[in-house]
Amino acid sequence: MSNIDLLKIEEAVKMILEAVGEDVNREGLLDTPKRVAKMYAEMFSGLHEDAKDYFRTVFHEDHEELVLVKDIPFYSMCEHHLVPFYGKAHVAYIPNDGIVAGLSKLGRAVETIARRPQLQERITSSVADTIMEMLAPKGVYVVIEAEHMCMTMRGLKKPGSKTVTSVARGVYEEDEVKRREVLSFIQMS
């Protein structure tokens, strides 16, 4: 959090409230700039973290088949409108030479990459590319489904609509059977 200028955020929030015609001195808004600054520091904490750090410790196991962590909840902020989007990520990889990561590391990588002004497409690619670089697996497949408040609260105003993005790396780019297999596991309840 030390790289985030909380006072600057507080001033900006005051300016926004004044610009929309609010009285920043009324009781309900007195601490709002401070609360918003703390919230942004938390929501953008991924700007000052590197998801690769989670994969510096690996394990060597006799396993070279699918590893899938499903339904990883996440939230992020749309970089176009600075409103939230949230959903779940499904992260799969096939280990190479038995190199595996702790399962929680996949969720932590999603969280770190999502906690910054973002696009869903970039989160999907960044998660896959981070795993490819750090674990050198035979393949990675990432699917993210999310609801975007910029489509729910404004513009299109379609609550409940979901955006789905996917990225295939390694064997998943070339092998349709493997792709279908991982998608069938993702769709299982």
From Swiss-Prot:
Family: Belongs to the GTP cyclohydrolase I family.
Any one GO biological process: tetrahydrofolate biosynthetic process
Gene Ontology cellular-component annotations: cytoplasm
Gene3D superfamilies in alphabetical order: 1.10.286.10, 3.30.1130.10
Signal sequence segment: none
Keyword Hydrolase: yes
Enzyme Commission number: 3.5.4.16
Self-association and partners: Homomer.
InterPro entries to which the protein is assigned, alphabetical: GTP-CH-I_C/QueF, GTP-CH-I_N, GTP_CycHdrlase_I, GTP_CycHdrlase_I_CS, GTP_CycHdrlase_I_dom
Lineage start: Bacteria, Bacillati, Bacillota, Bacilli, Bacillales
GO MF assignments: GTP binding; GTP cyclohydrolase I activity; zinc ion binding
Catalysed conversion reaction: GTP + H2O = 7,8-dihydroneopterin 3'-triphosphate + formate + H(+)
Binding site for Zn(2+): C78, H81, C150
Classification via HAMAP family: FolE
Pathway: Cofactor biosynthesis; 7,8-dihydroneopterin triphosphate biosynthesis; 7,8-dihydroneopterin triphosphate from GTP: step 1/1
Protein name: GTP cyclohydrolase 1
Top enzyme class: hydrolase
